[in-house]
Amino acid sequence: MSTVLYRCPELLIGGEWRPGRHEQRLVVRNPATGEPLDELRLASADDLQLALQTTQQAFEHWRQVPAHERCARLERGVARLRENTERIAHLLTLEQGKTLAEARMECAMAADLIKWYAEEARRVYGRVIPARLPNSRMEVFKFPVGPVAAFSPWNFPLVLSARKLGGAIAAGCSIVLKAAEETPASVAAMVDCLNQELPPGVVQLLYGVPAEVSQALIASPVVRKVTFTGSVPVGRHLAELSARHLKRITLELGGHAPVIVCGDADIARTVNLMVQHKFRNAGQACLAPTRFFVDRRIYGDFVDAFGAATQALRVGAGMAAETQMGPVASARRQAAVQDLIARSVAAGARPVASAVPEAGYFVAPTLLADVPLDAPVMSEEPFGPVACAVPFDSLDQAIAQANHNPYGLAGYLFTDSAKAILAVSERLEVGSLAVNGMGVSVPEAPFGGVKDSGYGSESGTEGMEAFLDTKFMHYVA
């Protein structure tokens, strides 16, 4: 049991924590038990307008702060975040359900992301272009795009908020973050660490009715940049809103990651890595390996090993030290995943699963073997502890089947064949590819998708560029 007292946070507006004034409130629940933790007060229309007003004022000051000072302030915020890791991790496990070990890891990853962006603030360079005229100079400048409206989800609330906070603040922008109402306390604790080192209004945190918040922020002339991580349908809607108001937007949307396992792969190592990666956070990850295309020559051995490892996972409350996989985040997610499994089994898939606790929002970690290509699980993102496996007879067939899907976020390949690596790296339609490993998301490299998985990148220099505008100057003496 956690000794951390859980309380839903207030809103952070203008450097001050204040209660939301919306008439509607939301109950935050512990996914491991289904019991209520606290009641969250939401932002009213007046709260949203106040946040917009103060973010504009803060931007006018923050954009002029030297990059070295922005870096130093963010690094002090990161130090506070690391000092508070244990408390924040407990809050995250209570409200989201993931294991405490995973929550600690997420807090560390969020700190690494913000630290990288802080350092990158000192490396925002322009360039000098050789002049066409005598006594003249042509230069290119980079400058902050302006106030940012950011929307982050509940599955990795710290990391996916940190990607937005770190880049925007380091670039010299102010930011209004609408974080997920399901996981408010952990994000608020992280934001508070940054806020204590920043001028009032540079970072603001809201919780509210999603449609009301997105409409108010994106339609406002104050906001100059939008960034969103979440589902494809919501991403489409926000893209339409942003287009209507000519706002730049970065979208990191769903994923249904293919894994191509060639005949020369080390089965034991592949299964060990992929079971860890697949069932992390109960499979609620857009980059989770989900569709396994396995060389027919090793398919039987692979399915047996993966199924055995899946059944051996210890499922339970995230606070228990022995737990390897916690619950899914909500009753709605539990019902959706169970429905997808049932429809896919009805279509011919063979399930391999284990028992789970009856209380709380638990779904058994499940391998669906011998899955027909037209089964629902092959096209619908599970966003839960479900993996599916099908055999292939040629690499061309595997690549074609992997690409036969609207998503294109992450992909995985296991082989020692240089020819296979070259073919898959060129032809697999994904934004990130890991070969013989799991590393598709690190602070210093761009992360983003293709097709229905969105556009634009977070992290890496590309992620920093998303918060910058470009100006050309031609000066004649």
Swiss-Prot record:
Q: Name one GO molecular function term.
A: succinate-semialdehyde dehydrogenase (NAD+) activity
**Under which EC number(s) is this enzyme classified?**
1.1.1.257
Active-site positions, per UniProt?
Answer: E252 (proton acceptor), C286 (nucleophile)
Q: Which reaction does it catalyse?
A: 4-(hydroxymethyl)benzenesulfonate + NAD(+) = 4-formylbenzenesulfonate + NADH + H(+)
Keyword match ATP-binding: no
Task: List, in alphabetical order, the GO biological process terms annotated in this UniProt record.
Answer: gamma-aminobutyric acid catabolic process
Sites binding NAD(+) sit at W154, N155, K178, A179, A180, E181, G230, S231, L253, E381
Cross-referenced InterPro entries: Ald_DH/histidinol_DH, Ald_DH_C, Ald_DH_CS_CYS, Ald_DH_N, Aldehyde_DH_dom, Aldehyde_DH_Superfamily
Keyword Chloroplast found: no
Fetch the Pfam families from UniProt.
Aldedh (PF00171)
Q: Which family does it belong to?
A: Belongs to the aldehyde dehydrogenase family.
Q: How does it assemble?
A: Homodimer.
- This chain's protein is named Putative 4-(hydroxymethyl)benzenesulfonate dehydrogenase TsaD2
Give the taxonomic lineage as stored in the record. Answer: Bacteria, Pseudomonadati, Pseudomonadota, Betaproteobacteria, Burkholderiales
- Per UniProt, what is the name of the gene that codes for the protein in this document? tsaD2
